[in-house]
Amino acid sequence: MKALAALRPRDIQPFSTDDEPTVIQLFESFTAPLRGGRNGTQESTVATAKALHLLAPAFLPLWDNPIARAYGQFPMLAHNYVAFCWQMRKMAGALRPCLPNPDDCTVLKRLDEFSYAVYTQQWVQLGLA
């Protein structure tokens, strides 16, 4: 888990193509052990993303089924997660200047809360039609 230790202190902003193989390897190595369901054979890439986010909260984003679908990253495989990282990097870069006072909430966590409110719970309607 040397690779994960190197990602833990990092922020999403410098995410680059050099990071892609590491993220794919971590994603795939976490997915199999986090299987669930009745027979323990159902892969949960939601659980994978949650675990990775807990271990590198400013670098590896959270997702769930509605969020992944909303960002066009379904069926939620490792390469989709990398594409999602790129999307979150771009959004984090746009959002960061709007957050003048640093606090204990990472930009990725703020983006997750936004996406959860809009796409998972549908508490917020964007009206972008």
PLM-predicted stretches and their roles:
Residues 5, 52-53, 101-106:
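Homeobox/homeodomain signature
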Residues 1-43:
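Helix-hairpin-helix/helix-loop-helix acidic hairpins
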Residues 54-61:
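Catalytic Zn2+-binding segment of zinc metalloproteases
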Residues 22, 26, 43, 47, ...:
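Residue-level detector of well-ordered alpha-helical segments, enriched
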Residues 1-5, 30, 59, 81, ...:
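Generic hydrophobic, helix-prone segments enriched in Leu/Val/Ile
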Residues 33-54, 67:
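Helix-hairpin-helix
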